[in-house]
């Protein structure tokens, strides 16, 4: 695993955040399928994420064979992340933590949101314990060159519940492996920070 520079970490985290935030648009899917995007996959492989990069490329090729690839991915996004917790891998800390550990995690997240003056998106009405909000805080820490704090944030805020979330994405009943592969890639990035 190659040690990543700040800009490389930000590039990967922003990319993953955008892909995990909501259903893919036609434009996002076309970009992923474009030949030019293979350079990004090569970059991921070069820095130590070869397994995840290769799996993602293969999955994108499989998705292209569907009659309506974006609709298949939209259905998978819903099934994977938006239904109730018995069938979906809910991307919320509160789905995996409870009691005092949840209370402490959420209190610390609220302090981060206040510190960075981040507002919860009122259009999507996402709670502060959504994975994408955690990624936004992590990105802010990196942007402000707070590398040590970013590593602590990963250990104390994300990895306390993310492994259970990642495992659950693998068990969802979906037609493609696109989202589980993205989550595996994010997990690998977080572990190798």
Swiss-Prot record:
Keyword rRNA processing assigned: no
Cellular component terms per the entry's GO annotation: cytoplasm
Localization terms from the record: Cytoplasm
Keyword Chaperone assigned: yes
Protein name: Chaperone protein TorD
NCBIfam families per record: PRK04976.1
GO biological process: protein complex oligomerization; protein folding
Gene3D superfamilies for this protein: 1.20.120.1820, HscB, C-terminal domain
Gene field: torD
